[in-house]
From Swiss-Prot:
<dbReference type="InterPro" id="IPR000473">
    <property type="entry name" value="Ribosomal_bL36"/>
</dbReference>
<dbReference type="GO" id="GO:0006412">
    <property type="term" value="P:translation"/>
</dbReference>
<keyword id="KW-0689">Ribosomal protein</keyword>
<dbReference type="Pfam" id="PF00444">
    <property type="entry name" value="Ribosomal_L36"/>
</dbReference>
<comment type="similarity">
    <text>Belongs to the bacterial ribosomal protein bL36 family.</text>
</comment>
<dbReference type="GO" id="GO:0003735">
    <property type="term" value="F:structural constituent of ribosome"/>
</dbReference>
<dbReference type="GO" id="GO:1990904">
    <property type="term" value="C:ribonucleoprotein complex"/>
</dbReference>
<protein>
    <recommendedName>
        <fullName>Large ribosomal subunit protein bL36</fullName>
    </recommendedName>
</protein>
<dbReference type="InterPro" id="IPR047621">
    <property type="entry name" value="Ribosomal_L36_bact"/>
</dbReference>
<dbReference type="GO" id="GO:0005840">
    <property type="term" value="C:ribosome"/>
</dbReference>
<dbReference type="InterPro" id="IPR035977">
    <property type="entry name" value="Ribosomal_bL36_sp"/>
</dbReference>
<keyword id="KW-0687">Ribonucleoprotein</keyword>
């Protein structure tokens, strides 16, 4: 999980999800693309 000040989609399969006030990027096909903002 990468923690960044600005999260962007790396690949088209990425999904941007908001959980508990934080923005996450999740990708089932490429778990290494996981990101969290903050």
């Amino acid at each position: 999980m990468k923690v960044r000040s600005s999260v962007k989609k790396i690949s088209p399969d990425d999904q941007i999800v908001r959980r508990r006030g934080k923005i996450y990027v999740i990708n089932k096909k490429r778990p290494r693309n996981k990101q969290r903002q903050g």
